[in-house]
A protein has these predicted regions:
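Cytosolic juxtamembrane amphipathic/interface segments immediately preceding
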Residues: 6-19, 79-89, 128-129, 133
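Helix-loop-helix units of permease transmembrane domains in multi-pass membrane transporters
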Residues: 112-146
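Hydrophobic core segments of alpha-helical transmembrane domains in multi-pass membrane transport
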Residues: 30-39, 105-106, 208-216
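Long, hydrophobic alpha-helical segments
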Residues: 90-117, 149, 156
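Secretory targeting signals
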Residues: 143-200, 210-213
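Aromatic- and glycine-rich beta-strand/loop motifs that create alpha-glucan
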Residues: 1-32, 197
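Terminal transmembrane helical anchor/hairpin motif
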Residues: 42-80, 211-233
């Protein structure tokens, strides 16, 4: 082991990217595709419903908003009923909380896989026997997490801007996606330092995600401050 606490970080970073290049690519492509396809599918559904009713998509959106604003189950599962009579507000309601939960899961699994899971498999011990510092592994996986979330946030913003959404709001939404992912990556990094086994660290991180979802659900249904405590709020 090197005396330099961060020695070998670059090599470990390249190793993580080589091992996870397919997984991370699939995660990012899947999320960005979901984010990009949803507006088009929503618009098609609204247009079809408007054609059946002989009205406009805006009127259908307003009708559905009136129903959803009083539906506690939908609010608990999907998020606050803000601006549901607008296309952007309806999109955030339909997929916002769900997407953030997936982003959180991606980050939790990434951190656990390259920390405690590596130690349990014995690969971490082999790496540490070389000229690698004690903080190199955590630093390398943290860099990967930051880069992954930045790419996701940027991709999300680009998709929204390409769809004709407001540039400022698109950037804000992409930033919120990236920051939520980084928060759960940080939570996972804390738990892998507390617990010896990867499953325990992953379990506690997922428990944190469940608590965040529950706080958001209760806060949104009751329209109170609890949702402000949740990174999914």
């Amino acid at each position: 082991m090197s005396r330099n606490g961060f020695a070998g970080t670059t090599k470990l970073l390249r190793l993580i990217l080589r091992l996870d290049r397919i997984k991370l690519t699939l995660w990012l492509l899947g999320l960005i595709t979901l984010i990009g396809i949803t507006p088009y599918s929503m618009r098609a559904i609204l247009d079809a419903e408007a054609e059946l009713q002989g009205t406009t998509a805006e009127e259908v959106l307003a009708q559905q908003a009136a129903l959803l604003e009083t539906n506690g189950a939908s609010i608990a599962l999907q998020g606050p009923p803000d601006a549901l009579d607008t296309f952007g507000g309806r999109y955030a309601f339909e997929i916002g909380a769900f997407t953030l939960a997936i982003v959180a899961l991606m980050n939790i699994l990434l951190i656990a896989r390259h920390t405690r899971a590596e130690e349990e498999s014995g690969r971490a011990e082999l790496v540490r026997a070389a000229a690698v510092g004690p903080w190199s592994a955590l630093t390398a996986v943290s860099i990967v997490a930051v880069a992954t979330n930045l790419i996701l946030g940027l991709g999300t913003s680009i998709v929204f801007i390409a769809d004709g959404r407001d540039v400022g709001r698109s950037i804000l939404y992409g930033a919120s996606m990236a920051l939520s992912g980084l928060l759960f990556a940080a939570i996972a990094l804390i738990w892998v330092q507390v617990f010896e086994y990867g499953r325990a660290a992953t379990g506690m991180s997922l428990a944190g995600l469940a608590v965040a979802f529950a706080l958001r659900a209760v806060g949104d249904v009751r329209d109170n401050w609890l949702s402000l405590l949740s990174p999914l709020g």
